[in-house]
């Protein structure tokens, strides 16, 4: 089986595990991008702790779920967003103002739209979580 978008697969695994009420889930294959997105989700309080486990291949992330995710997904295509355009994309992908988070990749790394506003930096949209 060929994975065309590992980030989208990882987010759908998390969403489906949350929907059936599981306490944890396993994401494979692991990558730096997925790890950085999980870190942002952890910092914003959507997931519990996560850890990388080496399995002799690409590795595995074990994620502790806390029941805070209603929906999450990857944004395709990866739209480029300037600092002044965040509100437009929040209206498109998030259900209400100040509810949920957009995750984007910037020259400063993978961060949320709130941190991007503080740092006055734009980037490309990766995913949304609420």
UniProtKB/Swiss-Prot annotation:
Q: Name the domain of life.
A: Archaea
GO biological-process terms attached to the record: translation
Keyword list (alphabetical) reads: Ribonucleoprotein, Ribosomal protein, RNA-binding, rRNA-binding
Matches recorded under Pfam families: Ribosomal_S8 (PF00410)
Looking up SUPFAM superfamilies in the UniProt record yields:
Ribosomal protein S8
**GO molecular function annotation:** rRNA binding; structural constituent of ribosome
Coiled coil (UniProt feature): none
What GO CC annotations are associated with the protein?
ribonucleoprotein complex; ribosome
| InterPro entries in the record | Ribosomal_uS8 (IPR000630), Ribosomal_uS8_CS (IPR047863), Ribosomal_uS8_sf (IPR035987)
Protein function: One of the primary rRNA binding proteins, it binds directly to 16S rRNA central domain where it helps coordinate assembly of the platform of the 30S subunit.
The record ties this protein, via NCBIfam families, to: PRK04034.1
HAMAP family from the entry? Ribosomal_uS8_A (MF_01302_A)
Provide the family line: Belongs to the universal ribosomal protein uS8 family.
UniProt subunit comment: Part of the 30S ribosomal subunit.
Protein name, UniProt field: Small ribosomal subunit protein uS8
